[in-house]
């Protein structure tokens, strides 16, 4: 969250709400009935963590309200009734979700005006693709989607959505580590695994080859220190975890990988504009931050596309926040302020 016109968000925190697992016995300790974001993260050992957004759709509106309240009053320290608000959502989200979001903003927070933008379109803004043409693969915590955009317009019938993203990768890593005898089961422990994934995971250019390397040498092994001081070593897990993006069948999902879904989305478009889309594949979102993902994506799409086609995968360094940055650009345009 932040202010229009800024080049980076002022506040970045996980959208989690934590409630104490046990009732407080010591009076006057200032215990709260709910903690949000970083505070929930730091006290996670005594809390049960809830994720009010699942697969890009808000599933618990009371908790969403807490998160927005925390954003306005604690993080940005603004009075919402004095500021128009730009919110974002995943494409193909249910209409009821947007309506409820609008209702809370106007009725609970009394905002003077609001606008809901599609995340992938904002990423294209942020990537500086001024032609407004390209295909965006936006993969966050709960959902990945492929959005072909032509001259600034998202093409709805060619949007493909994949309910596979960061949280599924974290769960997959938890499962792999459990096979090795490490127990990560609670919601708090899941956050430890997420941190491990973000710090150590990478995408292999050739998965089978990488497995061979992992078997024959310890060159890819890395240590990770748990909060209690215990050190665990992870090797093949580092690339097995994000491989799920390219092979969802590894976690039992009957879906095509992100490379195939990108290709399918391009193929749904007219022959005339496919060339522009192949030459402008833009990655965005936290789950595209794995080292090696752009090279692998390029390799896989080159194998699927016609041999004469020029493929270009763009992975802007700030892509973790490119949706927010695009929102900052859009919200500061005078044309939007007139709406």
Swiss-Prot record:
Keyword Cytoplasm assigned: yes
Gene Ontology terms describing biological process: cell division
SMART domains: ACTIN
Top-level enzyme category: hydrolase
GO annotations of cellular component type: actin cytoskeleton; cytosol
Record SUPFAM superfamilies: Actin-like ATPase domain (SSF53067)
Other comment: There are at least 7 different actin genes in tobacco.
Protein name: Actin-54
Species per Swiss-Prot/TrEMBL record: Nicotiana tabacum
Taxonomic lineage: Eukaryota, Viridiplantae, Streptophyta, Embryophyta, Tracheophyta
């Amino acid at each position: 969250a932040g202010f229009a016109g800024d080049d980076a968000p002022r506040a970045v925190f996980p959208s989690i709400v934590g409630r104490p697992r046990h009732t407080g016995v010591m009076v006057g300790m200032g215990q709260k009935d709910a903690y949000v974001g970083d505070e929930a993260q730091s006290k996670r050992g005594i809390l049960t963590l809830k994720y009010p957004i699942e697969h890009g759709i808000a599933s618990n509106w009371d908790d969403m309200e807490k998160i927005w309240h925390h954003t306005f009053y604690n993080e940005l320290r603004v009075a919402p009734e004095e500021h128009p608000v730009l919110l974002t959502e995943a494409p193909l989200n249910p209409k009821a979700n947007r309506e409820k979001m609008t209702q809370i903003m106007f009725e609970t927070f009394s905002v003077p005006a609001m606008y809901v933008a599609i995340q992938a379109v904002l990423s294209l803004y942020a990537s500086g693709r001024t032609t407004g043409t390209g295909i965006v693969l936006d993969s966050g915590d709960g959902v990945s989607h492929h959005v072909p955009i032509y001259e600034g317009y998202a093409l709805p019938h060619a949007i493909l959505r994949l309910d596979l993203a960061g949280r599924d990768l974290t769960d997959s890593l938890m499962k792999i580590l459990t096979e090795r005898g490490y127990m990560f089961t609670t919601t708090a422990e899941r956050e430890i695994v997420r941190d491990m994934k973000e710090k150590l995971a990478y995408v292999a250019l050739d998965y089978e080859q990488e497995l061979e390397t992992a078997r024959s040498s310890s060159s890819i092994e890395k240590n990770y220190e748990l909060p209690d001081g215990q050190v665990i070593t992870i090797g093949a897990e580092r690339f097995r975890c994000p491989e799920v993006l390219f092979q969802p069948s590894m976690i039992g999902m009957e879906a095509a990988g992100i490379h195939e879904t990108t290709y399918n989305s391009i193929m749904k478009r007219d022959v005339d504009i496919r060339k522009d889309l192949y030459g402008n594949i833009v990655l965005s979102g936290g789950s595209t931050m794995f080292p090696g993902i752009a090279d692998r994506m390029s390799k896989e799409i080159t194998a699927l596309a016609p041999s004469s086609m020029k493929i270009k995968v763009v992975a802007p360094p700030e892509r973790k926040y490119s949706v927010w940055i695009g929102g900052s650009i859009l919200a500061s345009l005078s044309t939007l302020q007139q709406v």
